[in-house]
Each structure stands twice: as C-alpha cells, then as structure tokens.
A protein has these predicted regions:
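Bacterial N-terminal signal peptides
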Residues: 6-16
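Loop/turn elements at helix/coil->beta-strand transitions in domains of secreted/extracellular proteins
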Residues: 23-26, 51-56, 80-84, 195-200, ...
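Structured catalytic cores of large enzymes
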Residues: 67-246, 255, 260-263, 272, ...
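Catalytic cores of nucleophile-dependent amide-cleaving enzymes
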Residues: 116-183, 291-406
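Caspase-like cysteine protease fold
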Residues: 407-494, 502-507
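Amphipathic alpha-helical scaffolding segments comprising HEAT/armadillo-like alpha-solenoid repeats
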Residues: 454-464, 485-497, 517-528, 548-560, ...
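Short inter-helical turns and helix N-cap capping residues of alpha-solenoid HEAT/ARM repeat scaffolds
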Residues: 468-469, 500-501, 531-532, 563-565, ...
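Structural detector for internal amphipathic alpha-helices that build alpha-solenoid repeat scaffolds
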Residues: 471-484, 494, 503-517, 536-548, ...
Length: 651
C-alpha cells in the first residue's frame, strides 16, 4: 500500500497522490517543523494505520489560516473516502463566533468581552464540511488563533462528516517535540495489545448534578447496560463520590495509576488548569467548621489586595456575623498562606500534578468545563496524554459545558470495538474534542461487523431489531433519524415505550425532540416518571422549554414529591416562570393543601413563594425586548437572555 503525501504551504499547494489504495482514508495533519522533528514516530503511526486497513494521507505544511486545511480535508472526503484526521503540533485553531446556540451552555456577550474569551475553540470547522463561515481574521497576538463567524445561511446544527483528534503539545520547542515523540512511542506499544474495555472508574465531584445521590447512583445502572464486561468483580467498576472522604485527591490518584484502568470518567467543575474534585470537607466538629470559616475569610482578604479594602471587609464581616478580629488572624502570615495553599491543592488536580500522577487510564472523559481548552499553552486534557502513563486519548470540552448534558451517550460502542472517533462523531457538540489519537479503540469484534457508511435505512432498521446491545440499538436510531426514515417520530415513541433499557429510552427521548407534532409533548407525561433520573431531569427541562400550562400539575407534583432528587427538583424551579403565573401559584396551593407528607406546610409555601418571586423578577426582564422606553442596551440584553430562557408569552 502506498502512503499518500501532501505538502502545503501558504504560497503553494502541491498534491502528490500515490496509487489509489482501497480502504478508509485518514489524514495525518502536522506542521512542517513538528514533522521534521518527529518524522520517525509519525511515519511509524502511519504504518500502523495501514496495517489496520486505513489509507493514510500525510498533510505537512505551514498553514496561515484554517481554510486551506479545511479545503484539503474536504477534497479527501469527497474523493478518497476520508474517515478521520489527527491534527499534530501547531495546527491553526478555529475560534468560532455567533454560534453559541450550538454549545450546551456557553453564552458570553461577544461585544462586552474580549474576542479571545467570547469565541469557542472548535475543530468542528475541520470535521463538519456543511457548516459555513465568514473569515474574521487571525488574532494579532496569537496568530495560531483564527476567528470565524457562523453564517446565517449555514446549517444551524452539527453533523460531523469525519472525526478528528488534536495532538497539541503543552510545551514549546524541543520539549514539545519530545512530548509528541514519547506519545507516539507509548501509543504504538499500547496498540499492540488486545485490551478490552472492562475496567472503569467514574468520579463525581462536588457541585456536580446538585450533589444528587440519585443521579450518582443511576450512572452505575446505565453503565452496566453499556459496558457489562466491567461489572465482573468489585474492582472492575468503581463509582466514587466527592464526600466519601474529606479530600478525595489521593484516592482518585490511586485509581488513575491503576495499570489495568481502561476508562476514567470525571463529572466535575473545571478550568484549563484545574479539576475541582472537592471543596471544603463536610464535618460535624465545631472547631473544624470554625477553621473552615477562618480560612475562607483569609482567602477573601488576600484577594482584596490593598489594606484599606481589607479593613473595610473586616468591619463589614464583624458587624454582619458578630465576630472579632481573631477570625482574620494569619491572612498576611507567609507560613499561614503556604499552609492554606497546600490545603487548597488537596481539593483538586492542577496542571503540575498530572505528570507526577502519570495516569494509566487508556481513555479519560472530562465531563467538565474548559479542561480541553487547547487554545491555551497548557491544558488539563493535554497534560494527561503527554504524561508518562498509559493514557492515549481524552475527551474534553474547550469551553464551559452544561451539567445537564448526557456525557455517556452511546458509550457502550467503545466496549464493542468502535474507534473513539467513530463514537465521538455521533455525539459531537461544538465544544467537545478528542485530545489524542481518534483511531484508538479497545478490543472487540462487533464494530467490524457494522457498516457505518451505509445509507440503507433497511440495514439500520434490521440492526435495531436484531441487536442485543442497547447502544447498537441507539446507534441505529441515530442513523435512521439522520437518514430521514419515514414515520420516525412514531418509531421513536414506540422504541421509548417498549425498551427496557435506560440507554435506548434516553436516545429515543433525545431524538424525538427534533420532530414536530405532539409526540414529544405527550411522551413527557410518561418520561417525567422514568426510572432513569437523567430522563426525569431532562423531561422537567423540556416541559419548561415547551412552556405549556398543561404541564403545570406535573411540575408541581414533582416539586412537592421528588425533593430527594436534588437535580430534578432544582430544574423544576427554573420552569416556574415559563408558564402562567396565576395558574402555577394556584396549582401549587391546591396540591400542597392536599399533601399529607409535610408537617410544616407554611414553610414549604414560603420557600416556594421566595423562589417564585425570584423567577418572576427574571421573567420581567424579558419584557424589555419590546419596551421602546428602555435603552437599547437593556433591550439587547433582554433579547440575549432569551437564549437560555424560553419565555413564550413574552415572545
């Protein structure tokens, strides 16, 4: 098999193709300097792909803007069966603007905030060829960053044509080249192993899912359906919760270092440089509680800066909390500052921790904000793959991400031998990215029996009916939906009503939202009581998004009866202002009067009124959109608020 070689420069374009080879196309994209420094390792990777049935193309050059590269990838897709690409080294970073509706949560004012901060680093620019953009130019200080605006005549949804992965080093110069060389060496060693996906660890950090134990417990039930091989003994599937121990960092580190660990899944808050595992430990000891309070005061005083501001804060706190100056002692003491800093480091994993941990999980999923922000020189997801352990790929987000987003959709495909990229292509959002080799896969022979390229709806219908694994059924539902199978809304409704699997019902639920008619609204009356907490959570959210007063009795009942499902209960409060205020209040009073579970109904009513009043104040802001007496700035702000708040009556 002859490898295809493509050299690109800013001034010339030279395409040199070898004899056309059968098989799936794959593009190895690398800047010229990196290829020169890492040629042996990159060529060895290409040879590995050839052995696995790919027809790899090497694209090496010095790109000034992403458009040149996108055109070449599109050409390979149209004419050479391109399936995926890996972007190695200093490859231009598309910074997408005017596409926040394609993100799960990112909503930042593009006029008020700097362009760099209010754009989304996204390789959907490279792997979804139907999206259309206007070129806004490169960043003046960081020319690797290139800004694009999503056009109004572009598709307003994501449906990636190929899959992609990034291999951007977290060090500069020779150190960065060494990272890439070392990565490919360990990748080649691991790819020689036939390693099944049968050891999984999931960690839920403080603040995730409103600290709901129900949500935490249900993820184990879901993953047992998806990855049954991991549930063979007490150590092969572990689900850790932030309050199992005062500081969980050491326990998490131990799990990451396990030589047999295949998949690590983090549900946590994050930044480019940190994973937040825990906050202040919960304790019943009064002295520990007081010390935690003193530490918070010290941290706030240090952030305040000048002495005058510190004294002002102290006076405010002493009057408000009736405390003395002893609560602030040590704020300026260097030894106390170091002690507080060391304690703070116990609450999370920072950039410099990762090389010391040397994580061995072959794949790590970060269900977190910003851990995959590859516009930064160093970022958590990158540090994981370049550490000395066995981690080969991470799946992470380049900006903030919605907590109420399913992070394990179709995850069972990985255990069946599908490549990480094949899985990610089905579930991509604007901010999600593979960091590392997208062709990596765990051992399994089912994937080779599934033709992902076919557009024959009869094939996918047969797969849905015959498949034993629930995520194969879920994949079939996705393909049938993408291909426009007639009567899909009815088919999805039937799939939800008949399937015993959490994962199949979830995919049917999520896909049914894309169709008009009454099918989805009618399904919500049943799905709001689904055994799977995440479906209940999303059902509540969907009722609020639809905004029909018909749902008021259902939402009130959930609010009063499901207070132990913290995240579901939390989502209900965000629906109070989406429907008729008087009807919502009257129904709450009616059901509360009939409720026999609450010993103090007056307190429950007061809590509802407090939340209800707050939501009504927020809803009132939406009226500014049409109020010509308001300043233009206020009206624009109100219009932006509608992106996350579906106020149908005001619109």
């Amino acid at each position: 098999m002859v490898r295809k070689l493509i050299f690109l420069t800013a001034f010339s374009l030279l395409l040199t193709y070898g004899v056309e080879a059968a098989g799936k196309g794959f593009a190895i994209v690398v800047d010229q300097s990196t290829y020169t420094a890492c040629k042996a390792e990159i060529d060895a990777y290409s040879t590995l792909l050839e052995r696995e049935g790919f027809s790899p193309s090497l694209l090496s050059g010095e790109w000034k803007q992403p458009d040149e590269l996108r055109q070449q990838l599109h050409h390979l897709y149209l004419h050479h069966q391109l399936e995926g690409a890996i972007l190695i080294g200093q490859i231009p970073v598309p910074m997408i603007r005017d596409a926040q509706h394609l993100t799960s949560a990112f909503k930042m004012d593009q006029e008020r905030f700097p362009k760099r901060d209010s754009s989304v680093p996204s390789d959907r620019f490279y792997d979804d060829f139907d999206l259309r953009f206007d070129d806004l130019g490169s960043d003046e200080e960081e020319p690797l960053l290139h800004y694009y605006s999503l056009r109004g005549d572009s598709p307003q949804y994501i449906q990636s044509d190929i899959y992609s992965g990034r291999l951007k080093p977290t060090r500069q110069g020779e150190e960065g080249y060494q990272q890439i060389r070392s990565y490919f060496r360990k990748l080649l060693l691991e790819r020689e192993q036939q390693n099944p996906l049968d050891v999984v660890v999931a960690y839920t950090g403080e603040g995730s899912f409103s600290n709901s134990l129900t949500a935490w417990r249900n993820q184990g039930m879901m993953m047992r359906e998806q990855i049954p091989a991991a549930f063979r003994n007490k150590s092969s599937a572990k689900f850790l919760f932030f309050n199992m121990y005062p500081y969980m960092k050491e326990l998490v580190t131990e799990q990451l270092r396990r030589m047999d660990l295949d998949l690590m899944l983090f549900h946590e808050h994050g930044t480019p440089d940190r994973q937040y595992l825990t906050a202040l430990p919960h304790t019943k000891e009064s002295e520990e509680q007081m010390e935690a309070g003193r530490r918070l005061f010290r941290q706030a005083l240090r952030r305040a800066g000048d002495v005058q501001q510190q004294e002002k804060l102290k006076q405010t706190w002493m009057e408000l909390y009736r405390i003395d100056t002893l609560w602030f002692a040590g704020a300026d003491d260097p030894k106390q500052r170091v002690a507080d800093s060391l304690l703070d480091l116990q609450t999370g994993i920072v950039l410099d921790d990762v090389p010391l941990i040397s994580p061995n999980a072959r794949m790590v999923i970060f269900d977190a904000c910003y851990n995959g922000d590859f516009r930064e020189e160093r970022y958590i997801a990158g540090e994981y793959i370049f550490a000395d352990g066995k981690t080969l790929a991470t799946f992470a987000n380049s900006v903030n991400v919605l907590q109420d987003k399913s992070s394990t959709d179709l995850l069972g495909l990985l255990g069946l031998g599908f490549r990480i990229g094949e899985w990610a292509r089905e579930i991509n959002i604007l901010e999600s990215h593979i960091i590392g080799d997208p062709t990596f896969r765990f051992a399994g022979d089912v994937a080779d029996q599934v033709d992902l390229r076919t557009t024959d709806t009869a094939y996918w219908l047969a797969l849905y009916n015959k498949a034993d694994h629930p995520d194969l059924k879920g994949l079939a539902l996705h393909k049938l939906s993408d291909l426009g199978y007639p009567g899909m809304a009815e088919f999805l409704t039937k799939a939800y009503n008949e399937s015993p699997y959490y994962s199949v019902r979830l995919q049917a639920f999520l896909l049914l939202q894309l169709y008009g008619g009454d099918h989805f609204a009618q399904l919500l009356e049943k799905s709001i009581n689904d055994p799977y907490e995440f479906i209940r959570r999303k059902s509540v959210y969907a009722m609020g998004a639809i905004g029909s007063d018909h749902f008021i009795p259902y939402l009130v009942k959930i609010y009063l009866d499901n207070y132990l499902d913290e995240r579901v209960h939390f989502n209900v409060t965000f629906t109070f202002d989406r429907m008729d205020f008087d009807a919502m209040e009257a129904e709450m009073k009616r059901q509360l009067d009939q409720n026999i579970s609450y010993p103090d109904k007056e307190k429950v009513w007061e809590e509802f009124q407090h939340i209800f009043a707050s939501r009504k104040r927020i809803a009132a802001m939406a009226n500014d959109v049409t109020n010509r007496e308001k300043p233009l700035k206020s009206r624009i702000s109100a219009a932006r608020m509608l992106r996350n708040n579906n106020y149908h009556k005001q619109v």
